[in-house]
Amino acid sequence: MNKNTWVIGFTLFAMFFGAGNLIFPPNLGLDSGQFFWPAILAFVLTGIGLPLLGVIVGALDKEGYIGALNKISPKFSILFLIIIYLTIGPLFAIPRTASTSFEMTITPIIHSNSSIALFIFTIIYFIVVLYICLNPSKLIDRIGSLLTPLLLITILAMIIKAYLDFSGNSAGKGNEALYHSNFSSFAEGFTQGYLTMDAIAAIAFSMIVVNAVKLTGITKTNQIFKQTLTAGLIAAIALIFIYISLGYIGNHMPVSDMKLNELKSHDRNIGTYLLTTMASTGFGSFGKYLLGIIVALACLTTACGLIVAVSEYFHRIVPKVSYKAFVLVFILMSFIIANQGLNAVISMSIPVLSIVYPVAITVVLLILIAKFIPTKRITQQIPVIIVFILSIFSVISKLGWLKINFIESLPLRAYSLEWFPVAIIATILGYLVGIFVKQDPIKYQQE
């Protein structure tokens, strides 16, 4: 394993390790109570396992996901990737990095969620993002060689001290309405992993990793695949350690019901409160500055990776508009949405993610299956269409816009996983239909 692989792996870790990766694990730990392990393992599965798979699958075709999705349908490829890039880009994920940075660096100092302070902070934040992203060829070096080691050192310092401070406590009772059995806790942890957005971000980051590997002089698809896999494993191991550590500490932190109600009444995110408490308990007044460094680095690296990925994709499909113009447009969009506040951004993203995630997971698994089992285009199209339609109606029913009894009666509906058995059945149906349709098996392009 050479130095370039380590740098690419650390860069991938830093791009994945953003806002959600900090605030969701301790919150999950607090809520899961006595059922911490099934919850955190499921969270790791969707928060790390699926993203790792997503990055690796993107290296199966020399054109990445663009080429692989074109095998399903060229029109679907464009539509799906536009939705993916906007979701992980200026509509939700990038604004969340800015609003999380504000809540965890500025709010503890000024003791207020001032809209004016948020406005000023996001201006400075996105100016820094703009500077880094205007030259994407240096992104890997700037993040992997400089920012990631600094991020790892600071996060490790906080985790070790917080573990010593709180590991002696027993686990709290948690949210017993959601976490009341091993299965319910696993299902809840699985769906909570959606909120990191990493499984769909992997589709974008895969292209950055593959291009970075190619820049090292590797051109053969099988070698690119191996290097991408190795870099992905480096990122995954680091993320697993941090997720479980933050979750375990959150699980053992004493937080009263009165305090939780107070946080909710002031529209404070509970995950950010837990992290702030970890830092201040371990390092006193210096703790909030240490945490500020961690958050700023984590969110900044993710925002830069996303801006570059989104801008490069849109420049590719609309070459008449320059890459730099897209960078400016998406940063402006992110700035506007970030000023709605962290909780508002998270709330807005949940319905969209509930539609996009099942389709994204289905697509990634179908591409992987097609690598090893002869698969026709119709075989992939059927489950994708069915899961997409089901996800839309599931969200409509869950929001109460229209109660759909059929949706509510599906297996695993209570855990928001009703799409999974349907996806399996639809895939089997796709293979059966494929027997009667004259199409050549899908073959992914090699160098």
From Swiss-Prot:
Its main location: membrane. The chain crosses the membrane at residues 6-26, 40-60, 74-94, 114-134, 143-163, 193-213, 229-249, 290-310, 326-346, 350-370, 382-402, 417-437. It is a multi-pass membrane protein. InterPro entries: Brnchd-chn_aa_trnsp_Livcs. Keywords: Amino-acid transport, Cell membrane, Membrane, Transmembrane, Transmembrane helix, Transport. Gene3D superfamilies: Amino acid/polyamine transporter I. GO terms for molecular function: L-isoleucine transmembrane transporter activity; L-leucine transmembrane transporter activity; L-valine transmembrane transporter activity. GO terms for biological process: isoleucine transport; L-leucine transport. Belongs to the branched chain amino acid transporter family. PANTHER family: BRANCHED-CHAIN AMINO ACID CARRIER PROTEIN SAOUHSC_01411-RELATED, BRANCHED-CHAIN AMINO ACID TRANSPORT SYSTEM 2 CARRIER PROTEIN. This is Putative branched-chain amino acid carrier protein SAR1419.
